[in-house]
């Protein structure tokens, strides 16, 4: 798979494993590391500092969560050492599966971005972010990347048209104001569609701090990258910290 992060194009060797997963059951167990970014402009904290104290308080709050909502946005501390921590799990990953992914993400981020005040990491089933900036209900236009299958489909024109239509249909469902659990917007939808001789499986998701209007704007933004990452490809995804989409020719979600 070819990966793009920011304005840099690289070959993401780790993403090759996404092409060779042999079964739905193994897909359900996959939690591959995808990407990370250390936001150096936010600086670093020192051992024993107030910022480290507040990060640890935020992480303890996350650790005590039941992960049933699959999302949390936590604020700890006071200026100038205020910490904002967010996690979100994929729409089919919650409870113990969500917790397992977030634990891996926290460990991975600490290893890859030691003592960074701002950093984000993506795994196959979750994302985790630490920041000094309050981004609640705000779209992050800075941090995104894409992964695509190197193999092409046969009828590219038909495939692009119908896959785009499926993603648009799922977006409308995800951003429907009636798509709620309790008093919270779901902002997630998944489905499949027969295109020619193939079944296409897809999902769209936004972080649950967004409202439906903000999430619709986020989806519109990432769908503009479809032509760069995915046209004519057998699989592809665009991931940001605020929203993402994915489609494949095989099932990749739990029922």
From Swiss-Prot:
The keyword Repeat applies. The keyword Translocase does not apply. Pfam families: Stress-antifung (PF01657). Coiled coil: none annotated. Residues 1-26 form the signal peptide. It is found in: Secreted. Its main location: secreted. InterPro entries: CRR_secretory_protein, GNK2, GNK2_sf. Residues 33-135, 141-252 form the Gnk2-homologous domain. Keywords: Repeat, Secreted, Signal. One of its GO terms (cellular component) is extracellular region. Belongs to the cysteine-rich repeat secretory protein family. This is Putative cysteine-rich repeat secretory protein 27. It comes from Arabidopsis thaliana. The lineage of its organism: Eukaryota, Viridiplantae, Streptophyta, Embryophyta, Tracheophyta.
């Amino acid at each position: 798979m070819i990966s793009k992060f920011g304005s840099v194009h690289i070959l993401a060797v780790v993403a090759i494993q996404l092409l060779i997963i042999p079964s739905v059951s193994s897909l359900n167990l996959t939690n591959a590391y995808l990407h990370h970014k250390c936001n150096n402009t936010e600086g670093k904290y020192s051992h024993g500092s107030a910022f480290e104290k507040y990060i640890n308080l935020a992480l303890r709050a996350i650790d005590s969560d039941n992960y049933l909502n699959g999302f949390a946005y936590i604020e700890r501390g006071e200026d100038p050492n205020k910490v904002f921590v967010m996690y979100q799990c994929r729409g089919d990953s919650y409870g113990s599966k969500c917790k397992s992914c977030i634990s891996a993400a926290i460990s991975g981020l600490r290893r890859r971005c030691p003592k960074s005040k701002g950093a984000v990491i993506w795994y196959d089933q979750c994302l985790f972010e630490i920041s000094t900036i309050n981004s609640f209900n705000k779209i992050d236009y800075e941090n995104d990347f894409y992964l695509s299958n190197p193999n092409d489909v046969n009828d590219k024109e038909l495939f692009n048209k119908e896959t785009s239509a499926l993603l648009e249909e799922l977006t409308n469902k995800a951003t429907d104001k009636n798509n709620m659990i309790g008093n919270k917007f779901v902002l997630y939808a998944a489905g499949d569609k027969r295109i020619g001789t193939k079944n296409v499986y897809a999902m769209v998701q936004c972080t649950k701090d967004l409202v439906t209007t903000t999430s619709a704007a986020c989806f519109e933004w990432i769908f503009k990258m479809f032509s760069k990452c995915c046209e004519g490809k057998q699989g592809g995804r665009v991931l940001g910290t605020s929203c993402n989409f994915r489609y494949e020719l095989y099932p990749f979600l739990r029922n």
